[in-house]
């Protein structure tokens, strides 16, 4: 019995004991990890609360530069420019006040490298005797003109230091240098040019880039017969034009216009009808004439045989309907 109990205890107790030991070891390691994370969180909170440490928007006073500091930097830059040294020597002398300025105020705030380069570039672009203005909203509109015209310094905020804004030196329509009279004269000149272009296009029947619309031959012939001057002809033609292209408007002449009411055979039919009318007294032979059964064509109003304007000899719906009804009727003898 003793050997059996020992064997059972070893078989069950050893795995259970090892599992408990491993659980205790992992728990201790987890507690150490939690303590380290808590310590890091406390350090981050202290850095955030510290005014001379991490970036915080609650302590804007530490991010603002004083006016005297800006004047000192600008005076150092003037001394560099007045010395007449260019190239690497001027850049080294320009970096010296920036380095001293950075070392002096490193405990207050952190200025990125791109911001220092932008400030140095803007200072070099300014003329001598003008104070520095680092307003981001003014720079976005017209930095150079605002800096030249505003001698008072603007108190720099944290947003102006963190957001890089490049000066736009391109001339603008509504800049402060432009005079109101010059602007009004420019607008009036543009309006006159537009009116001249519009009148030129109207005289040339140039209404855009759409394809030229077709014209009715009958209405064109009536307008030409009733008008004796070129003015009436131009009016009738322009009234029949829907949209003429700019390319086709340059070429004007007495060209034949297509008939809107033409069908596949009506063009040849019209020519055949004209030949028949002219040779009616001398020629007794009948020529084949295509007779329309609709009211599309105005020339053969006497030959209209159907009231439906969509019917002709190819699409005779009434006849087809009668044929269909007759086919449904019972035939005799069946």
From Swiss-Prot:
Keywords: Cell membrane, Cell wall biogenesis/degradation, Membrane, Signal-anchor, Transmembrane, Transmembrane helix
Superkingdom of the source species: Eukaryota
Compositional bias per record (Low complexity), positions renumbered to this chain: 81-96, 218-248
Alphabetical GO biological process terms: cell wall organization
Subcellular location: Cell membrane; Bud membrane
Region feature (Disordered): 76-110, 204-248
Composition bias type Polar residues, residue spans: 204-217
Presence of keyword NADP: no
Job of this protein: Plays a role in cell wall integrity. Affects the cell wall polymer composition in the growing region of the cell.
Protein family: Belongs to the SKG1 family.
Protein name: Suppressor of lethality of KEX2 GAS1 double null mutant protein 1
Record lineage: Eukaryota, Fungi, Dikarya, Ascomycota, Saccharomycotina
């Amino acid at each position: 019995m003793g050997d059996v109990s020992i064997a059972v205890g070893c078989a069950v107790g050893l795995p259970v004991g090892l599992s408990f030991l491993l659980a205790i070891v992992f728990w201790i390691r987890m507690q150490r990890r939690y303590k380290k994370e808590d310590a890091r969180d406390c350090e981050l909170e202290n850095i955030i609360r510290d005014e001379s440490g991490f970036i915080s928007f609650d302590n804007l006073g530490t991010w603002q530069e004083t006016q005297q500091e800006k004047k000192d930097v600008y005076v150092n830059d003037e001394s560099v420019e007045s010395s007449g040294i260019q190239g690497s020597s001027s850049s080294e002398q320009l970096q010296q006040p920036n380095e001293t300025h950075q070392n002096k105020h490193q405990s207050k705030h952190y200025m990125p490298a791109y911001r220092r380069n932008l400030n140095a570039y803007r200072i070099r672009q300014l003329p001598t005797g003008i104070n520095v203005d680092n307003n981001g909203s003014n720079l976005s509109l017209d930095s150079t003109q605002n800096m030249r015209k505003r001698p008072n310094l603007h108190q720099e905020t944290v947003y102006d230091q963190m957001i890089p804004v490049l000066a736009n030196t391109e001339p603008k329509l509504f800049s402060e240098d432009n005079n109101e009279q010059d602007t009004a004269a420019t607008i009036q000149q543009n309006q006159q040019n537009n009116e001249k272009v519009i009148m030129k296009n109207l005289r040339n029947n140039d209404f855009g880039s759409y394809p030229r619309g077709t014209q009715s031959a009958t209405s064109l012939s009536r307008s030409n017969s009733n008008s004796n001057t070129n003015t009436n002809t131009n009016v009738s033609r322009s009234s029949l034009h829907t949209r003429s292209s700019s390319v086709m408007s340059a070429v004007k002449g007495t060209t034949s216009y297509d008939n809107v009411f033409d069908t596949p055979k009506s063009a040849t039919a019209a020519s055949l009808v004209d030949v028949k009318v002219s040779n009616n007294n001398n020629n007794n032979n009948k020529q084949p004439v295509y007779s329309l059964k609709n009211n599309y064509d105005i020339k053969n109003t006497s030959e209209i045989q159907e009231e439906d304007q969509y019917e002709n000899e190819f699409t005779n719906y009434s006849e087809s309907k009668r044929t269909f009804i007759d086919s449904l009727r019972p035939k005799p003898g069946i």
